[in-house]
Amino acid sequence: MNFDAVFSSPLQRAIRTAELAGFPDPQLTPVLREVDYGEYEGMTTKAIHESRPDWELYRDGSPGGETPAQIYARATDFITLASAVKGRVLAFSHGHFLRAVAIAWMRLDIKAASALHLDVATLSLVRDDERGRVLAMWNSPP
């Protein structure tokens, strides 16, 4: 499959995934970096829930990190970047951020991102067709 642009988060795990998928020279863009978890960086959701049982990333954000509105705005920034490409775009990023991209693509409230499950190293496809912006494939194994 050919792509007109391949973008990646500047984090090594995304770059390495791009390389393993056969794309050794993606365009690095900080807009695709993982969500800034602030004080929760490095903590599991389970650990966060021990002190904040009702915490939800896309509703509450993270203390000292990105707010849900900031996550959504950055997702929209990536959509703008990708939409400027005439043709097919491939992106290597991170789970929580890619959920936000899918939700922003469909113009839904960021809180809806919590309903999306996304495994590591899976394929998802958004596109514009006669119905408008659609989530054509989600969390599919390679």
Question: What is each residue range found by the language model?
Answer:
Residues 1-2, 82-87:
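Glycine-rich phosphate-binding loop signature in dinucleotide/nucleotide-binding domains
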Residues 35-46, 103-142:
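Acidic, low-complexity terminal tails and accessory targeting/binding regions
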Residues 76-83, 102:
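Generic structural signal for well-ordered alpha-helical scaffold segments
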